[in-house]
């Protein structure tokens, strides 16, 4: 463990239970005489690996609402075949309540990308993923704030649905006020009429290095 760190949670027991089920551990352990001079036995190996270097690694993410209602996400983590572009887009889509196709992920350009320590140390899904979550939460607040201006109401009267922002309590028809505004309209009006692009940048670092766990079983003869 780094810096005397104590693991606050562990699912190693679930890994072991699953691998025992997959290999038929209870029927085969510790060994089985095949009756032909051969014996079969089973064994289990377990491992853990920290996620990022605690108190050292940092990840940053920028997400922007475009004038067409789609999102642009700029990251500093390089996709070296690990699929992190897809993984981080999935995280953002979950947070923003939208489809993955609504998010365009831009590859790394160290001249302009937000800073990231790098795609190493099993850190991207955990560290950069949490930076995505923080960025999405900040961006949603900005979207709601801008929608409140357009709908002439308080921010606490609105909710973000993913495709639009709407009033929690609808106003009567004929009142002269709208009950809902689409994300496309928000992005378009913010960028084209207010000279303002809705975007957010957040960073994430971790005081701990939470480890994923694994268990594997083998049968030998």
Language-model features and meaning:
Residues 96-100:
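Phosphate-handling active-site elements
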